[in-house]
């Protein structure tokens, strides 16, 4: 069940929330058995929840929750700084220096900034040039400049938020890409050796502005690739303007922020969507029999140690294919005002306010 019903999009509602007729609307307001009950939903602006005094578990300490949806990162940070919000999700890295560090808490997330290479056509149809790009990137410089140190070096597709992953890798916790990375120095079994980039090899590097750090990363990443001999054209737009083109293979490389276990709680779903021959989110267009076999084996293995081993074997097969280059394991910076206790710091970004959360002013 956890691997099938972990996504908030797959929430199971109270029978009372469902309409009596086929054309009726689902209405979750006022229904539910959790510690808090949704009392008012204000579209995209916010929501109000009240403590459920009939809750079957530990009664919530807080009488309720007033939620405000604030898409602007600077505005979220300002709400914490001015003490107009008690808990703030996703404080932007650029705002960290303006806030009391005692109010900020970093949480490793199962989200990786990843460069997908188009294996269908163009320069990156050549595995040796994919390896050249892998060796050309400098993730430490990207993390220092763009994330201001608030991210982890990329050891693979799965980062430190998946704590069991590292010990099942041949290269453990060593950084995967880069000139001195595990792949370039022979520590990744089966990794392709980098080829020489032919003069004038032109590529288009695409990303999106919805996550500011990606837009900031693109020019630096372009410089790193150009130093290896690639001629890079940058194309950065809003996500909804590039997704269809990226999936259709219109770009040679696409930089994305990808959640690896968030939707299902299990990495197999992500690997299937992104890297199998039948994948629904295959920006690299990978068709690799070894990768397909490894993913299929992981999918067929029962949850537990053997499934974890199979997942890591699939990760290695994907990395060896060169279809994707991990660049940074992202962290979320959670803001908690003075007086807040018991807030959940959840790598899966599912739990935040619990029965134990309190605010004392």
Protein language model regions, located:
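Short, well-ordered beta-strand elements
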Residues: 34-39, 47-48, 63-69, 87, ...
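Extracytoplasmic/peripheral linker and loop segments enriched in polar/acidic and small residues
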Residues: 233-234, 239-242, 272-337
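Long beta-strand-rich cores associated with HINT superfamily self-processing modules
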Residues: 334-361
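Ligand/substrate-recognition segments at binding pockets and active sites
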Residues: 191-260
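Ligand-site clamp/hinge motif
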Residues: 46, 52-98
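Alpha-helical secondary-structure segments
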Residues: 34-35, 63-64, 82, 110-155, ...
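Structural transition elements
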Residues: 149-193, 211-216
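Surface-exposed binding/hinge segments that line
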Residues: 1-18
């Amino acid at each position: 069940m956890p691997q099938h019903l972990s996504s908030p999009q797959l929430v199971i509602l109270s029978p009372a929330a469902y309409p009596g007729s086929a054309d009726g609307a689902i209405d979750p307001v006022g229904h539910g058995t959790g510690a808090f009950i949704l009392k008012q939903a204000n579209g995209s602006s916010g929501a109000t929840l009240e403590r459920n005094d009939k809750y079957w578990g530990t009664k919530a300490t807080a009488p309720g929750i007033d939620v405000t949806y604030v898409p602007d990162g600077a505005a979220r940070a300002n709400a914490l700084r001015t003490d107009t919000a008690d808990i703030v999700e996703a404080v932007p890295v650029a705002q960290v220096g303006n806030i009391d560090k005692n109010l900020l808490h970093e949480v490793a997330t199962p989200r990786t900034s990843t460069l997908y290479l188009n294996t269908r056509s163009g320069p990156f149809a050549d595995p040796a040039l994919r390896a050249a790009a892998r060796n050309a990137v400098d993730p430490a410089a990207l993390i220092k400049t763009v994330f201001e140190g608030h991210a982890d070096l990329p050891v693979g597709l799965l980062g430190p938020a998946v704590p069991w992953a590292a010990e099942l890798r041949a290269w453990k916790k060593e950084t995967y890409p880069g000139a001195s990375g595990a792949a370039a120095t022979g520590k990744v079994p089966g990794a392709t050796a980098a080829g020489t980039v032919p003069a004038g090899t032109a590529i288009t590097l695409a990303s999106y502005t919805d996550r500011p750090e990606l837009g900031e990363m693109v020019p630096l990443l372009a410089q790193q690739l150009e130093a290896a001999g690639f001629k890079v054209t940058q194309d950065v737009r809003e996500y909804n303007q590039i997704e269809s083109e990226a999936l259709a293979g219109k770009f040679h490389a696409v930089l994305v922020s990808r959640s690896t276990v968030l939707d299902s709680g299990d990495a197999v779903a992500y690997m299937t969507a992104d890297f199998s021959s039948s994948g629904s989110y295959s920006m690299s267009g990978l068709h690799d029999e070894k990768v397909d076999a490894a993913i299929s084996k992981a999918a067929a293995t029962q949850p537990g140690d053997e499934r974890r081993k199979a997942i890591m074997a699939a990760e290695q097969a994907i990395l060896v294919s060169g279809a994707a280059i991990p660049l940074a394991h992202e962290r979320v910076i959670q803001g908690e005002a003075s007086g807040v206790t018991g807030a959940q710091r959840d790598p899966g970004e599912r739990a935040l306010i619990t029965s134990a959360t309190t605010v004392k002013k």
